[in-house]
């Protein structure tokens, strides 16, 4: 029996930290190969896949203070880090799993990426290409989570999948507290009121206003991404 995906178009948010693998910094080739195959398993269902990547494996905005850089400049440095990750993932998707991939950057740099144009992004998706959005929103003071929510709304994605290293949303940090409880389903407002670190308020509000459900899952568990897209119960869902 042919498996039917629940969603036709998805926005996948990958953190920069995931790219670092076990070493904690830089880009781990093993993760690139792994995530390429995980994405291909979703792509092969006929799903249109757009991706937003963080840059935390290379540079994080709050590091700016330590080196005497102001917040806006530090954020721009972080945006450039996302472009490095986007190019690495583009190469992996094209070389490991042979999927045509386009990088669209919110900060113009025509030699390495196409400029972000909403209609062009949608056209690429319709033509069966994977689209990677780099450069965050193109503005300082906005996180890549907010960029993910914004792009999801702009392209009409039916779901935002936040790929993390934990099994979903917990009532407290599962890495610190072994008795942390997984929350299967929760509303946007509850996430904000409980102070859960799923996404920042700007990103959550964008998803709420545009009725985009958020699935938080452990991307390191093989097949999770595909199961989520098929509508199976994986991780946690934020909606309503």
Curated annotation (Swiss-Prot):
GO MF entry, a single one: UMP kinase activity
Q: Keyword annotations for this protein? A: Allosteric enzyme, ATP-binding, Cytoplasm, Kinase, Nucleotide-binding, Pyrimidine biosynthesis, Transferase
How the protein is activated or inhibited is described as: Allosterically activated by GTP. Inhibited by UTP.
EC main class here is transferase
Locate the residues binding ATP. 13-16, 56, 60, 164, 170, 173
Family annotation (SUPFAM superfamilies): Carbamate kinase-like
Look up the record and name the pathway of this protein.
Pyrimidine metabolism; CTP biosynthesis via de novo pathway; UDP from UMP (UMPK route): step 1/1
UniProt record similarity statement: Belongs to the UMP kinase family.
HAMAP family under this entry? PyrH_B
Oligomer and partners: Homohexamer.
Function, as annotated: Catalyzes the reversible phosphorylation of UMP to UDP.
- What is the designated name of this protein? Uridylate kinase
User: What does UniProt list as this organism's lineage?
Assistant: Bacteria, Pseudomonadati, Aquificota, Aquificia, Aquificales
